[in-house]
Amino acid sequence: MGRVQLFEISLSHGRVVYSPGEPLAGTVRVRLGAPLPFRAIRVTCIGSCGVSNKANDTAWVVEEGYFNSSLSLADKGSLPAGEHSFPFQFLLPATAPTSFEGPFGKIVHQVRAAIHTPRFSKDHKCSLVFYILSPLNLNSIPDIEQPNVASATKKFSYKLVKTGSVVLTASTDLRGYVVGQALQLHADVENQSGKDTSPVVASLLQKVSYKAKRWIHDVRTIAEVEGAGVKAWRRAQWHEQILVPALPQSALPGCSLIHIDYYLQVSLKAPEATVTLPVFIGNIAVNHAPVSPRPGLGLPPGAPPLVVPSAPPQEEAEAEAAAGGPHFLDPVFLSTKSHSQRQPLLATLSSVPGAPEPCPQDGSPASHPLHPPLCISTGATVPYFAEGSGGPVPTTSTLILPPEYSSWGYPYEAPPSYEQSCGGVEPSLTPES
């Protein structure tokens, strides 16, 4: 065995997650098989962010630092054989951003220790990553408890000479949710044509924006629900819910290089119609009772009123009457065909030394009474704490895989903003989106 048999960093009480402004205490342990002369023993606490133009590349194009503090644990001398412990303590800045790790960049907080030896001898180094969570209180966001509503109208041609339109309206009960909360979705589809529509699909999207030489947008589907299509000259309503899985919070206050947004996108493929609702994911739930919108009747401010179509052609009306079908104004309710959701990667916890147990899947209380449960974010993000004792409950449906980055240079176009969705403006890839 070598002269240095053990050189490691441990944090007090085995903690791995801290809040901004908290003290961080720990110990540097050294075990020597023989005396070791040294020039200095130092420990450093560092927080930084790096962004790259290529996926999974740590050659950062842009970097920014949040804190860098050093302590001298011992001056020049010699350590005798045996075990030695050096306690340390740092105060984390109140502005430190939440830890995050993605394919194009990450926010990393770590403690590094080094034994600087005399000239021509090898220095000894070790490090330990810890995580910072700056909780997002959804109640601090204006109008967060209000319903989220958007509408889109698509005009199209069919059978060469006939024209029609589809009015798609979608709404949610709130504008912000926490992990494990059910997002209540209401959709209203008015098929003002003689052609059946394709199935209606609702997707919860995550958009992570990285500021390198230009903005890079990484968009992936977190959960997806598919309903039935709407028959010709019919109006249909669809009520569904999406359980919010373990996800990193919206935005990353204190970091100017990485930003996280979430969207609920409701769409039809034929005819092509899409509405996009921005939603917030936080750590502290909305404490106001939500205002339930009237399904299919809510419209964003300034939007034109829904137009009731004229009666269908005479031959179609007669066929409808003979079949005993419902009137256009009598909405039918769509059934759900499939529901798929990405599952949390619980296996990644094993790579975090001393990490607490993950959230119980059955909603039972956490084993540790002093701390909220530790959850795992989907994708390549880091563990974080969520409010409450219940964890996300993954479905048994097909897993939705993230985009394959090896086959293309950059992620595809970001989803449109709320204003673009409501105003019919084509989305563009801009830093403000």
From Swiss-Prot:
One GO CC annotation? extracellular exosome
Q: Does the keyword Membrane apply?
A: yes
Q: What is the effect of changing P416A?
A: Loss of interaction with ITCH
Residue ranges of the motif PPxY motif 2:
415-418
Top-rank taxon = Eukaryota
Q: Where is this region: Disordered?
A: 296-322, 349-372
- A single MF term (Gene Ontology): identical protein binding
Provide the protein's localization.
Answer: Cell membrane
Q: Kindly state which keywords UniProt assigns to this record, in alphabetical order.
A: Cell membrane, Membrane, Ubl conjugation
Has the keyword Ubl conjugation been applied to this entry?
yes
Subunit structure as annotated in this protein's UniProt entry:
Interacts (via PPxY motifs) with ITCH (via WW domains); the interaction is direct and participates in the recruitment of the ubiquitin-protein ligase ITCH to the NOTCH1 receptor. Interacts with ARRB1 and ARRB2; the interaction is direct. Interacts with TSG101; may recruit TSG101 to the plasma membrane. Interacts (via PPxY motifs) with WWP2 (via WW domains); ubiquitinates ARRDC1. Interacts with SLC11A2; controls the incorporation of SLC11A2 into extracellular vesicles through an ubiquitination-dependent mechanism. Interacts with WWP1 (via WW domains). Interacts with NEDD4 (via WW domains).
Describe the family membership recorded for this protein in Swiss-Prot or TrEMBL.
Belongs to the arrestin family.
Domain remarks in the entry?
The PPxY motifs mediate interaction with WW domain-containing ubiquitin-protein ligases.
Identify this protein by name.
Answer: Arrestin domain-containing protein 1
